[in-house]
Amino acid sequence: MESSSVASASSEAGSSRSLEIEELERFIDSYVLEYQVQGLLTDKTEGDGESDKTQSNVSQWTVECTERLEENRTSPRNREPTYSQNGNKEGPLDMLGTDIWAASTVESISGATWDLQPEKLDFTQLQLRQRNSPKHPPPQIDRDGFGKGKRVEGDDINLNDIEKVLPTWQGYSPLPHEADIAQTKKLFRRKRNDRRKQQKPQGGNKQPPSQQNDHQPATAKHNSREHQRQYHGNPPPPHPSGKQGHHGYSQNRRWHHNQKHLPNDLQRNAKETDTLKIEDASVCTVHIPLDIHSNTDSTERHCPPANDSEAKRKESIQSRDRPKISLLQSSKDRLRRRLKEKEDVAVESTNPQKTKMDKLIEILNSMRNNSSDVDYKLTTFMAEAQNSANSEEMLGEIVKTIYQKAVTDRSFAHTAAKLCDRMALFMVEGTKFRSLLLNMLQKDFSIREEMHRSDVERWLGFITFLCEVFGTMRSNMAEPFRVLVCPIYTCLRELLQSEDVKEDAVLCCSMELQSAGRLLEDQLPEMMSELLATARDKMLCPSESMLTRSLLLEVIELHANSWNPLTPTITQYYNKTIQKLTG
């Protein structure tokens, strides 16, 4: 009886083992057949002679990706470590010897060996390594809404309370010293009214010029000449009694609730400027343009009514209490284009007497994303470049010109990516345009940390152009360059972790995710999950600015909508919020 059970157990084990062997053989056959169809297996055997040199010069990008793969295999995610077919777990990531980031740099121009066909690379096994914990970690958020143990009342986050997630615009709590300011203004008004009542019986309906300068514009007794004298900073006539103003204040230092002095008034002294600076900002926020000439009369200006000025005063106090956000000029330009504001750009005409390279530069400078004839200019540039590129050096200069223009002017990045996509297969003496461009991107990616410290504008421009190239350019098989996926995720994560230009970096990350987020998630969804987790932690951190939280909330909501465009109402809400925060 025991022998029969042992025999049946051994037969079952043998049958299961034979099934596993057959399944492994089918997997190996399909693996070999796949690479035979793609033509990569033969290319690998032909390039075995050069594989030693390639592996000895592994680039920084390959090392980083290998480290990420190893750390993710050991990360606590309840995943079993995946082994390759030969059992070797620590082999190099570039199994086919076609690592585009391990190619030579731009300075050593060579032949067609630079075009290593990055569209055939497979990064499906690539994982992201764990993020380094920051010095001051954000508050731990239970994203599921429930703890693993006993739930404590008040620990969860109620997203229905939108005031905790995104600031509203219903006003701010009064400052501690606001009551003192209001009381001081009240005293000044009372003293001023008492002084006017005392002076009315003496002068009747005729008032001295000094009182006319202090009177409100609503009395309709001002003329344009008196307004001109007051706004140009001419000192008022002395008091009839020969005394100074009330409590030692001059006539110009009184609280004027319906008038605004010019910012370029040079006649006032430093004390008067300091005294009126806060009052002018809080009383009247209407700016009236003036043309000041020596022989011309200024037109009569009227301030808004008292109720309008009071509303303006409250709004100005709220804007003064709000932390000021300063953005780079390039970030302001990108926001302006997002909010669909018109941009007037002067375009110079082409001079036929200039050199060929100067003509190409002029065509590049005349291109804009919002111009109607951008396609025509792209075609003109391509024709001019083909006529000019008669050597490898000239082709390298053309690529360098386009690249420098794209990384220094972020508004040109999308147009430059379209131009590079059209000229990708352009070849001179065995050197492709695409290979030179990818090598330039690789070089700047390797020095991105130094670039971040020395030139923030160029750092942001490089990341923008890198994302635009990934979202626009396609390979011969109409697929995106998967070799750029991991560098882009690295750059986007560094944008969220930046501390010196927080708002500019978050704005850049938000806009690139809105344009290329779907494509990035299709290539490596796990890295997108890690990036969005960082974005959520940063959005819920109370130390972040309102602009940062608004931009990140928009990205998270866009991802929840499967990267489809949001409804016009929601889009208009975010646009108005950004206008208020950056205006």
From Swiss-Prot:
Listed Low complexity bias regions: 200-213
Alphabetic keyword roster: Cytoplasm, Nonsense-mediated mRNA decay, Translation regulation
Composition bias type Basic and acidic residues, residue spans: 43-53, 65-80, 141-154, 298-324
Domain MIF4G, residue spans: 361-562
Compartments reported by the entry: Cytoplasm, Perinuclear region
Compositionally biased tracts (Basic residues): 190-199
Segments of this protein annotated with the region Disordered: 42-95, 129-154, 190-251, 294-325
SMART domains found in the cross-reference section: MIF4G
Compositionally biased spans, kind Polar residues: 54-63
InterPro entries tied to this protein: ARM-type_fold (IPR016024), MIF4G-like_typ-3 (IPR003890), mRNA_TranslReg/HistoneTransl (IPR051367)
GO CC, alphabetical: perinuclear region of cytoplasm
GO molecular function: RNA binding
GO biological process terms, semicolon-separated: nuclear-transcribed mRNA catabolic process, nonsense-mediated decay; regulation of translational initiation
Family: Belongs to the CTIF family.
Protein task: Specifically required for the pioneer round of mRNA translation mediated by the cap-binding complex (CBC), that takes place during or right after mRNA export via the nuclear pore complex (NPC). In contrast, it is not involved in steady state translation, that takes place when the CBC complex is replaced by cytoplasmic cap-binding protein eIF4E. Also required for nonsense-mediated mRNA decay (NMD), the pioneer round of mRNA translation mediated by the cap-binding complex playing a central role in nonsense-mediated mRNA decay (NMD).
Name of this chain's protein: CBP80/20-dependent translation initiation factor
Lineage: Eukaryota, Metazoa, Chordata, Craniata, Vertebrata
